[in-house]
A protein has these predicted regions:
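Short loop/turn segments immediately following beta-strands, especially the blade-tip
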Residues: 48-55, 95-106, 152-159, 200-207
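Conserved beta-strand positions in repeat-built beta-propeller and related beta-rich domains
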Residues: 28, 36-39, 76, 84-87, ...
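Short coil/turn segments that connect the beta-strands within blades of beta-propeller domains
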Residues: 30-32, 78-80, 135-137, 182-184
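Beta-rich catalytic cores
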Residues: 21, 69, 126, 173, ...
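Beta-propeller fold detector
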Residues: 1-9, 57-62, 104-114, 161-168, ...
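Asp-box/WD-like beta-propeller blade repeats and closely related beta-sheet repeat scaffolds
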Residues: 1-24
Length: 231
């Protein structure tokens, strides 16, 4: 460990998030900056890594709407677009990213709801998981409470998203999801029901079909697929 940063401040939702709570930290695709998504104070803080001192330097802050609860950030493989999932407002915001200048630039170009329901601010719902398919053409998210998974088609030129479906996941309170390397299957971890559900994705019919029985696991929160190196 060469450096550590403590976020300070007071959030806007006293019942849930009233103090700094970093939920996701991810480098920009060009490895110039580190994005710290703070769910508690509705901010994404952007740090530069000083390679001479091995210290983090705050260079910018994405100040998100109050009571939106940013949770996860993902970047497209081409490094041009960033997608931020908002837990409390149940939205995905698309940003155009440019790291070529002295400071990073994030331009908001789209906001889309994680659920087609009208009341996106339903306090019983919480956007929870976000994953980009390996082909770069599809993005998936889960919404806990209503317990659904949504698939969006992604325009590779503009970065914009178009909803293709929102379907139930046959589990209670999904916390995360992951796309398999073949892009044909996805797994959802359900915290309350204590299961991992695997689905086959049919991109032509815009549906998912459960693949086998749910796997039992105690209160799962996250999931990741990591390749095993060949001997």
């Amino acid at each position: 460990m060469t450096d550590e940063i403590f976020h300070k401040g007071i959030g806007s939702v006293a019942e849930r998030n009233f103090r700094p709570h970093v939920n996701c930290v991810r480098p920009t695709p060009d490895n110039k900056y580190l994005c710290a998504v703070d769910n508690g104070i509705d901010q994404v803080k952007i740090y530069r890594v000083n390679k001479q001192t091995n210290k983090l330097e705050l260079v910018d802050i994405l100040r998100c709407p109050r009571e939106s609860g940013p949770r996860i950030i993902r970047f497209s493989d081409d490094g041009k677009y960033a997608y931020i999932l908002f837990e409390l407002s149940n939205e995905i915001k698309t940003y155009r990213y440019d790291g070529s200048g002295k400071t990073p630039e994030f331009e908001l170009i789209q906001t889309i709801e994680t659920s087609p329901k009208r009341d996106i601010h339903d306090t019983h719902n919480a956007a929870s998981g976000l994953s980009l398919a390996n082909d770069g053409k599809h993005l998936f998210c889960t919404t806990a409470g209503e317990d659904t998974v949504s698939m969006f088609e992604r325009d590779e030129e503009t970065g914009l998203l178009t909803r293709k479906f929102t379907l139930p996941i046959s589990g209670e309170y999904p916390k995360d999801l992951v796309i398999f390397p073949d892009d044909r299957h996805l797994a959802v971890v359900n915290h309350v029901s204590g299961t991992i559900n695997v689905f086959t994705v049919d991109y032509e019919k815009n549906i998912i079909v459960m693949h086998g029985k749910p796997l039992k696991i105690s209160e799962p929160n996250s999931i990741h697929i990591w390749p095993v190196p060949e001997e």
